[in-house]
């Protein structure tokens, strides 16, 4: 009876020894999915924001051509801020892919 119990404990230990690797593989897969979705949504939102900013600048310049230079400067500042958000999403995605603190 003791031999059977020892054998069952040994087999259970061997069977459960690989769970850490499976958990790491799953976490890597979820990290890739999250990075792709997060960066895709950030790029989509940034593109929509840039489009609205450019459209508003063009409409403002068409209404008052004298303010074209000021509107253009303001538009470039706004575009830089919008693009910074997408770059932040890229940095977070790269951290999730290559320097994931949960993988150990």
Swiss-Prot record:
InterPro entries membership: ATP_synth_csu_bac/chlpt (IPR005953), ATP_synth_F0_csu (IPR000454), ATP_synth_F0_csu_DDCD_BS (IPR020537), ATP_synth_F0_csu_sf (IPR038662), ATPase_proteolipid_c-like_dom (IPR002379), F/V-ATP_Csub_sf (IPR035921)
Annotated coiled-coil segments of the chain: none
Membrane topology, as annotated: Multi-pass membrane protein
Residue ranges of the TM segments: 31-51, 75-95
Compartments where found: Cell inner membrane
Pfam families reported in the protein's UniProt record: ATP-synt_C (PF00137)
Keywords, sorted A to Z: ATP synthesis, Cell inner membrane, Cell membrane, CF(0), Hydrogen ion transport, Ion transport, Lipid-binding, Membrane, Transmembrane, Transmembrane helix, Transport
Any one Gene Ontology cellular component term annotated for this protein: proton-transporting two-sector ATPase complex, proton-transporting domain
Keyword Signal: no
Summary of the function given for this chain in its UniProt record: F(1)F(0) ATP synthase produces ATP from ADP in the presence of a proton or sodium gradient. F-type ATPases consist of two structural domains, F(1) containing the extramembraneous catalytic core and F(0) containing the membrane proton channel, linked together by a central stalk and a peripheral stalk. During catalysis, ATP synthesis in the catalytic domain of F(1) is coupled via a rotary mechanism of the central stalk subunits to proton translocation. Key component of the F(0) channel; it plays a direct role in translocation across the membrane. A homomeric c-ring of between 10-14 subunits forms the central stalk rotor element with the F(1) delta and epsilon subunits.
UniProt similarity note: Belongs to the ATPase C chain family.
Entry protein name: ATP synthase subunit c
Gene transcribed to yield this protein: atpE
């Amino acid at each position: 009876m003791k031999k059977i119990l020892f054998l069952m404990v040994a087999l259970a230990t061997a069977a459960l020894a690989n769970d850490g690797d499976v958990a790491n593989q799953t976490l890597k897969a979820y990290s890739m999915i999250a990075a792709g979705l997060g960066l895709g949504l950030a790029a989509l939102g940034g593109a929509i924001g840039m489009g609205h900013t450019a459209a508003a600048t063009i409409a403002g310049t068409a209404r008052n051509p004298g303010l074209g230079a000021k509107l253009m400067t303001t538009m470039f500042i706004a575009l830089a801020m919008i693009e910074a958000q997408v770059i932040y999403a890229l940095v977070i995605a790269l951290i999730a892919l290559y320097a994931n603190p949960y993988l150990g």
